């Protein structure tokens, strides 16, 4: 049986299209089994720890539910629940946790940290988000596209907003590996790193995909099957005025969706600022009069929106990673 036993999941560039296809197929099968009430627990007796330097709703819940569904035990360590980097080095922490646990999940500020955990723990380590990478999110994105469009090959997907962010970077990698026609619609100041773009174009050449980085709305959005965006400012940051002035022309709204295909789906990794029901959303409306920030309420709540399918699929894809590396 094809598996990824004992592999860490740190960066999509570590995996082939065959690896990712296997994980997506396994995710879909695990989802079907759960819905049918016939899921087989393959992780009984396994112990998993998840370390969160940055808070999250979806990522924490997805890891915990995935583990519980498969019979594993899980420990959560929040930003105030460990000594990592303060009273104990990251290397020593990795060694300790590797003796106690069968796998480690990490969500935090630095890619170097998750790689350190993988290098010194000697158990599989899963990247739940770092400053430059969000690979578990992209698995859920690709699974959702496959569910709604039937296939990934040739799908045209446009990311609108900050082309340098971890989600845009990871989409760039994943779409290049899997042969999608991926476009980033962003201001020139926020184009992705040129070296990463070069690598992605090389991968796309092998997979039959295509990579376009542009500040032209028509070039990016025309005939898109999928329109994707992310928040403009990371949680805890406050430079909204500069970001809004730079990115307001890249908001996903009715004009954008009308340029895409009629059956185009809208995706967002969440959380999203689309209404006035958050402190930040209300504050931005009062200051700038924006109807939503990165996406309007009209589009977020439209029939084209599959954002909650994506959120649910975080569970199934993370579960697939656990099963394939530990089962």
UniProtKB/Swiss-Prot annotation:
GO MF entry, a single one: ornithine carbamoyltransferase activity
Compartmental location: Cytoplasm
GO process terms (BP): arginine biosynthetic process via ornithine; arginine catabolic process to ornithine; citrulline biosynthetic process
Pfam short name (any one): OTCace_N
Keyword tRNA processing: no
Pathway the protein takes part in: Amino-acid degradation; L-arginine degradation via ADI pathway; carbamoyl phosphate from L-arginine: step 2/2
Matching InterPro entries: Asp/Orn_carbamoyltranf_P-bd, Asp/Orn_carbamoylTrfase, Asp/Orn_carbamoylTrfase_sf, Asp_carbamoyltransf_Asp/Orn-bd, Orn/put_carbamltrans, OTCase_ArgI
Binding annotation for carbamoyl phosphate: 56-59, 83, 107, 134-137, 269-270, 314
Protein EC: 2.1.3.3
Catalytic activity: carbamoyl phosphate + L-ornithine = L-citrulline + phosphate + H(+)
Superkingdom as given in the UniProt entry: Bacteria
Keywords: Arginine metabolism, Cytoplasm, Transferase
Sequence positions that bind L-ornithine: 166, 230, 234-235
PROSITE patterns referenced in this protein's UniProt entry, alphabetically: CARBAMOYLTRANSFERASE
Keyword Ion transport in annotation: no
Entry GO terms, CC: cytoplasm
Annotated function: Reversibly catalyzes the transfer of the carbamoyl group from carbamoyl phosphate (CP) to the N(epsilon) atom of ornithine (ORN) to produce L-citrulline.
Similarity comment: Belongs to the aspartate/ornithine carbamoyltransferase superfamily. OTCase family.
Record-given protein name: Ornithine carbamoyltransferase, catabolic
Organism, scientific name: Borreliella burgdorferi (strain ATCC 35210 / DSM 4680 / CIP 102532 / B31) (Borrelia burgdorferi)
Lineage: Bacteria, Pseudomonadati, Spirochaetota, Spirochaetia, Spirochaetales
